[in-house]
A protein has these predicted regions:
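Mobile genetic element proteins and their domesticated derivatives, centered on retroelements
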Residues: 7, 13, 33, 47-50, ...
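C-terminal domain-tail junction helix/linker
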Residues: 102-163
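Short, flexible loop/turn motifs enriched in small residues
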Residues: 1-3, 14
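Active-site beta-loop-alpha junctions of metal-dependent nucleic acid enzymes
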Residues: 18-41
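A short acidic (Asp/Glu
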Residues: 55-61
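RNase H-like two-metal-ion nuclease catalytic core shared by retroviral integrases
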Residues: 75-98
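Acidic/histidine-rich, metal-coordinating catalytic segments
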Residues: 43-55
Length: 163
């Protein structure tokens, strides 16, 4: 069974990056944190994870030098009560699992299913916790038109591929 690790912005619920691994608690997910930092263009102020050791190890590898200068907090002992929890991430994991079950799992690391789910989650799906707005809309990225999928496809087809 393959495991999906993902990064999500807490305020906007924007799915930033993902990594597929063969193991759940021992995979090196440092590349995930580094990719998230590159995509966001900056290091986060707080990283909220569960208590798995590989999250702490990856946090140290990806942010340790910056941690001293930028005071990045790593909260890894989350609880369901209170304002420090990872329920938003767990909800997204459930959303992914529901879809993955139907197609019988993620077979490859570069599965197009994951990119499609990421696009749907960020640009098409309205979120109840965001008052019906999309994650992209909350982040200030607007997709105009009635059919957001069609708009995204049309815009993608206009883009020139990178060499």
């Amino acid at each position: 069974m393959r495991c999906l690790y993902a990064l999500m912005d807490d305020q906007t619920r924007f799915w930033i990056a993902q990594q597929v691994a063969d193991t759940k608690y021992t995979a090196d997910i440092t590349p995930l944190f580094q990719e998230g930092k590159q995509i966001a263009g900056k290091a986060p102020s707080t990283v909220i994870t569960d208590g798995a050791y590989n999250f702490n190890s990856a946090f140290r590898h990806a942010f340790w030098r910056e941690n001293k200068a930028l005071a990045i907090r790593h909260e890894r002992h989350v609880r369901f009560q209170g304002d420090l929890n990872n329920q938003k991430m767990e909800r997204m994991n459930g959303e992914i699992r529901d879809r993955e079950k139907i197609i019988r799992g993620v077979k490859r690391e570069d599965s197009p299913l994951l990119k499609g789910l990421q696009i749907y989650h960020n640009y098409v799906r309205p979120h109840m916790g965001l008052n019906g707005e999309t994650a992209a809309g909350k982040a200030g990225i607007r997709v105009e038109g009635k059919d957001k999928w069609l708009t995204i496809i049309q815009n993608a087809s206009k883009q020139k591929p990178k060499d």
